[in-house]
Design a protein with these regions (language model features):
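Extended, low-complexity, intrinsically disordered tandem-repeat tracts enriched
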Residues: 45-47
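Beta-strand-rich solenoidal segments
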Residues: 3-12, 16-19, 55-179, 195-199, ...
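Short interaction-hotspot residues at assembly and binding interfaces
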Residues: 186-196
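Short, solvent-exposed loop/edge segments of extracellular or virion-exposed proteins
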Residues: 177-187
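N-terminal alpha-helical "arm" segments
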Residues: 1-43
């Protein structure tokens, strides 16, 4: 049987309305997809080449209906320290993590340290009912390096599989409909093959990301 949920309304004496965090997250998750928002600097990760550090710009994101905001408290941007990588390159990941179990109930920027290797891979993202991570950037820590260069940072915010943008869920459908409407169908029953379908999916993701960036 279908179940309706709605909110939010003030209580009155004869009709008390109470809501908890899970109900608020339920509504927000239905409206907004996971990812960074256009708030402030969008949680962009950068490096200045002056040490084994990266910086995270002010901004915000939405993860599974929960909201995270990094703002200026007067002490400067958030700085992360990366460990030296020794004799082989390593790829770290800067993520925003939601910890939703009852003992934690917290969100924050976290540094995932990779494993040095001749062919290094970024740490896997944890995504389950209790912990959900979105990746802001990959950071390559080069062997024996004493600094992270600007070019060692790979922005992952625009990759929907890693992070994405906190745009309305209807936006992807609207973009897809726009693309379908713009296609000129010359044969009845025209169908996309696997390659064309993959290209179309990529274009939809690209346009969604561009729409989110233009809203900043």
């Amino acid at each position: 049987m279908a179940r309706e949920f709605y909110g939010y309304f003030d209580s009155i004496d004869a009709d008390v309305r109470e809501y908890d965090a899970a109900q608020f997250a339920h509504i927000l998750k239905a409206a907004v997809q996971n990812g960074v928002s256009s708030h402030e600097g969008g949680l962009e990760v950068t490096a200045d080449g002056l040490g084994l550090t990266t910086r995270v710009a002010y901004g915000g994101c939405v993860i599974e209906g929960h909201v995270y905001v990094l703002e200026d408290d007067g002490g400067g941007p958030l700085t992360l320290a990366h460990e030296p990588s020794g004799t082989a390159d390593r790829i770290d990941r800067v993520v925003v993590r939601l910890e939703n179990d009852q003992s934690a109930r917290i969100m924050g920027v976290r540094l995932l340290t990779g494993t040095p290797s001749a062919s290094p891979q970024p740490p896997a993202l944890t995504r389950n009912a209790q912990v959900w991570e979105v990746s802001l950037a990959q950071v390559r820590v080069r062997a024996s390096a004493t600094a992270v260069a600007a070019g060692d940072v790979t922005d992952e915010r625009g990759d929907p599989s890693a992070c994405g943008y906190a745009t309305p869920r209807w936006l992807d459908r609207a973009v897809a409909a726009q693309i379908r409407d713009s296609l000129t169908v010359t044969e009845a029953g025209y169908a996309l093959d696997a390659r064309q379908g993959k290209v179309l999916d990529g274009k939809i993701a690209q346009l969604s990301a561009e729409a989110a960036r233009s809203a900043r």
